[in-house]
């Protein structure tokens, strides 16, 4: 069940996910501490409520855009000069001592430290083990989280572009209908804030996992994933009360102002024998944008 090819694997429970503390640090700028509890009221509210059974959907999750791509590194070989050029005088060159190094462009670095509730962490790992032991021997919570991150970036971009037809096989029909009404009523800036570039996702957390059976004996797994991401969308600060705003230094040039937003995506899959192993998104919530 290569998660990368089909997307993710699954769960959900209902305990509060305590607000982890995130520290953002950039070269040449002041260190900023952000408390995720203060910016993710939506996630805290959802995780603190009791888990109610969610309608089952059988939409397929097969988009090739969700496959994970391995990073590639270019290899630079050594340049060899032809023999005819060996006799030519060497062109003047400048050497650098340890005290005089060629000036290099600074790169923005960010260090994220997140701390989850240890009880919630242990519980989700136990449920992940049960999924592996009884439902899917190829299931891995680490691979699922990575696939969920890619799915979040892909789906949020389509949402911001109002390409709802491309989401029909990824999002539950009832959920998609509600999203159409909410997203189309947003301003352009708020629509842009929905999109999360995968490089701007600073923290991912497994919020909840649930395993349950319906009255017909069908087996279902729900996994709630919480994401925190940066956006440079031009949104008035008063429209996002409680959101953290800070500056990111881009090398040695300009300074860009970004906001830290949160979103919750719930993934669902039916594990009944004979049913296709497809994942679907059963709930989408963007704190302060889609409420």
Curated annotation (Swiss-Prot):
One BP annotation, GO: protein insertion into mitochondrial membrane
Keyword list, A-Z: Mitochondrion, Transit peptide
Localization terms from the record: Mitochondrion matrix
Record has Transit peptide as a keyword: yes
Transit peptide: 1-96
GO cellular component: mitochondrial matrix
UniProt keyword Transit peptide present: yes
Protein task: Promotes sorting of SMDT1/EMRE in mitochondria by ensuring its maturation. Interacts with the transit peptide region of SMDT1/EMRE precursor protein in the mitochondrial matrix, leading to protect it against protein degradation by YME1L1, thereby ensuring SMDT1/EMRE maturation by the mitochondrial processing peptidase (PMPCA and PMPCB).
Oligomeric form and interacting partners: Interacts with AFG3L2. Interacts with SPG7. Interacts with SMDT1/EMRE (via the N-terminal transit peptide); interaction is direct and takes place before maturation of SMDT1/EMRE.
Protein name in UniProt: m-AAA protease-interacting protein 1, mitochondrial
């Amino acid at each position: 069940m290569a998660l990368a090819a089909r997307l993710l694997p699954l769960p959900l429970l209902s305990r509060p996910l305590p607000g982890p503390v995130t520290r953002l640090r950039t070269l040449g700028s002041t260190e900023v501490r952000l408390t995720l509890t203060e910016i993710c009221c939506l996630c805290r509210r959802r995780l603190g409520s009791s888990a109610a059974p969610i309608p089952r959907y059988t939409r397929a999750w097969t988009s090739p855009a969700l496959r994970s791509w391995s990073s590639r590194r270019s290899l630079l070989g050594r340049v060899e000069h032809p023999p005819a050029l060996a006799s030519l005088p060497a062109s003047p060159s400048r050497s650098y001592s340890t005290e005089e190094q060629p000036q290099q462009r600074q790169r923005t670095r960010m260090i994220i430290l997140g701390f989850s509730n240890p009880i919630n962490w242990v519980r989700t790992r136990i449920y992940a083990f049960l999924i592996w032991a009884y439902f899917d021997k190829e299931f891995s919570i680490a691979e699922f989280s990575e696939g969920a991150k890619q799915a979040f970036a892909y789906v949020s971009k389509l949402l911001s572009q109002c390409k709802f037809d491309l989401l029909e096989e990824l999002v539950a029909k009832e959920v998609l209908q509600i999203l159409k009404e909410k997203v189309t009523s947003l301003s352009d800036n708020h629509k842009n804030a929905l999109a999360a570039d995968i490089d701007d996702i600073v923290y991912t957390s497994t919020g909840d996992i649930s395993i349950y059976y319906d009255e017909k004996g069908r087996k279902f797994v729900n996994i709630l994933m919480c994401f925190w991401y940066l956006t440079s969308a031009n949104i008035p600060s008063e429209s996002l009360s409680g959101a953290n705003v800070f500056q990111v230094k881009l090398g040695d040039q300009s300074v860009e102002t970004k906001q830290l937003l949160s979103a919750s995506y719930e993934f669902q899959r039916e594990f009944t024998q004979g049913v296709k192993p497809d994942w679907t998104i059963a709930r989408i919530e963007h704190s302060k944008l889609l409420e």
